[in-house]
Amino acid sequence: MDKQKINEIEINGTVYVPKNSAIEMAESSDGLKPVLIRSYAAGVHFGYLKSEEFTAAGKVVTLLKSRRIWYWDGAASLSQMAVEGVNKPENCKFSMPVNVNEIVNVIETIPLTKVAFENLLKVAIWKQ
């Protein structure tokens, strides 16, 4: 009899997965964690979170090695992108990285998984 590999099981409406398939967060660089942020006016960016400060102008985030996500394809939401990355990188438009980027009025900060961060770093630089 062939053995079946079970990746998930549902019991009373709750889906369970093997312990070893838990989400692994991306590694820090110099103690800084990789994040995906969404701001009110400056769009979506990802990079290493250097600082967060709450000011009268809103939350100000400083990212290191930051890239702006001008357009993405292959993820239904930023939540999916932060967990899985994008599955159509050839259609994405990500800027070249900048060493330091201070972004004002950040409304969402999402930690990146290891899989997502490695995936996003591989998206080609979009320039005109």
Q: PLM features: residue spans?
A:
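Nucleic-acid-binding small beta-barrel platforms of the OB/S1 family
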Residues: 1-2
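Conserved RNA-binding domains used in RNP assembly and mRNA/RNA metabolism
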Residues: 5-11, 17-128
